[in-house]
Regions:
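Short, basic interhelical loop/turn and adjoining N-cap
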Residues: 113, 119-134
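Secondary-structure boundary/capping micro-motif
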Residues: 19, 78, 112, 176-177
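Mobile genetic element proteins and their domesticated derivatives, centered on retroelements
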Residues: 29, 40-43, 79, 109, ...
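Short, amphipathic alpha-helical "recognition" segments used to contact nucleic acids or chromatin
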Residues: 101-116
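Short, Lys/Arg-enriched anionic-surface-contact patches
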Residues: 85-105
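Short, conserved DNA-binding cores of transcription-related domains
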Residues: 1-86, 90-92
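Residue-level detection of the helix-turn-helix DNA-binding "recognition helix"
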Residues: 45, 126, 137, 141
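RNase H-like nuclease fold core
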Residues: 133-182
Length: 182
């Protein structure tokens, strides 16, 4: 598969597709990293060796109504330096932690949720309601979490009328940066 297509469709610019599978209404792309790690990120030693691998599946953006599974061979690396204990798997730039979906898929789900319910979105994409809810909760937590109060030295408080009558709102602002705290 063309690596330019992998990059533009799913953001896989450091990976290559080794083969494709078609099972029912699902496209499975088998990918692996283009280049292997050569230098230990912990000690800088140049003898980093492969130490096994694991296969992980990620839900990718659908194509033409077909579900896309990105099946990645995640390589583990171990440092040969006796003083170093580095033994980790390679980084996965298109997904976070143990998530089973890509960043672009999560962005797509959030876009659909602007006009659809959780149930409708899960039915359309053929994924569980729990996965859609997890994506939505992560999005809300990231964008609407309370701001950090670290480094705030002085605040300003303003109360204003939202509508004429007895509806008042209070706003708390960091006076140095102008960021709204509450």
């Amino acid at each position: 598969m063309n690596s330019s297509f992998l990059y533009h469709a799913w953001g896989l610019y450091t990976h290559k597709c080794t083969r494709e599978e078609y099972k029912g209404n699902t496209i499975i792309l088998h990918i692996e990293s283009k280049e292997r790690e050569k230098v230990c990120p912990k000690c800088g030693h140049r003898q980093l060796v492969k130490n096994g691998f694991r296969i992980r599946d990620f839900i990718g953006l659908p194509i033409g109504g077909k579900k896309v599974i990105i099946r990645m061979k995640v390589q583990r690396y171990k440092c040969k330096n006796k003083d170093c204990d580095y033994d980790r798997q390679e980084k996965i730039p298109f997904a976070t932690g143990s998530c089973s979906y890509t960043h672009r898929f999560a962005k797509y789900v959030v876009g659909l949720l602007r006009g659809m319910t959780l149930k409708d979105t899960s039915n359309l994409l053929g994924i569980s309601w729990d996965t859609v809810k997890e994506i939505h909760a992560r999005h809300l937590e990231y964008h609407y979490a309370p701001p950090s109060l670290e480094g705030v030295a002085s605040i300003g408080i303003d109360e204003f009328a939202a509508r004429k009558g007895h509806v008042h709102k209070t706003m708390v602002v960091d006076l140095k940066t102008g960021h709204i705290l509450y």
